[in-house]
Amino acid sequence: ENIKACVFDAYGTLFDVNSAASKCKEKLGSKWEGFANAWRTTQLEYTWLRSLMKKHKNFWEITEDSLDHTMETFKIKKEMRNELLDLYKKLSPYPEVKKCLEGLKAKKIKIAILSNGTPELLKMLVESNNIQNYFDDIFSIESVGIYKPDSRVYEMPIKKYDCKPENICFMSSNT
């Protein structure tokens, strides 16, 4: 009753960050899962380090940098880079996502994404999965220039929906 909006993180919450590597299982071989996990871990570490150093780089550049590092660590052929990056732009949603969004829409609750991703990347993700019509807003950290968990990031939906933090249900797979 007090919830005005449900705000989802995108990567790892709505979209399976391992799905790009999963689609390349045959080429990556048995190390695909370790590779996928290392890529994501490196990506998150790079965002935290950049925030601490106050040297912002957009999420796509960090995704590329973390992929390059992980490919080198796992000795993956350079030819796979573009394929993995193209697949990352179209990550698969988790199976329960559409049903969850439909349920929230039926309750007339505002639905939004709050993500480290760039506006362009997030738009591509929701459109490639045909779920763009479920979202009232997509908030990107690019408008504040610092990564989560900085409090300024979470103020965006609070200001937009003119409410208190306790009126927003924020859902994320990252803690």
Predicted regions and their residues:
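Active-site neighborhood of HAD-like aspartate-dependent phosphohydrolases
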Residues: 1-44, 73
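An amphipathic alpha-helix signature
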Residues: 21-22, 36, 40, 60-68, ...
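Substrate-recognition element of Asp-dependent hydrolases with the DxDx(T/V) motif
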Residues: 78-92, 97-127, 137-141
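Short helix-capping segments at alpha-helix termini
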Residues: 28-32, 73-79, 106, 130-134, ...
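Glycine-rich phosphate-binding loop signature in dinucleotide/nucleotide-binding domains
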Residues: 1, 106-109, 161-167
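A metal-dependent, Asp-based hydrolase signature
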Residues: 33, 47-83
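Acidic di-acidic motifs
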Residues: 172-173
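Substrate-recognition "cap/lid" segment bordering the active-site pocket of phosphatases
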Residues: 118-169
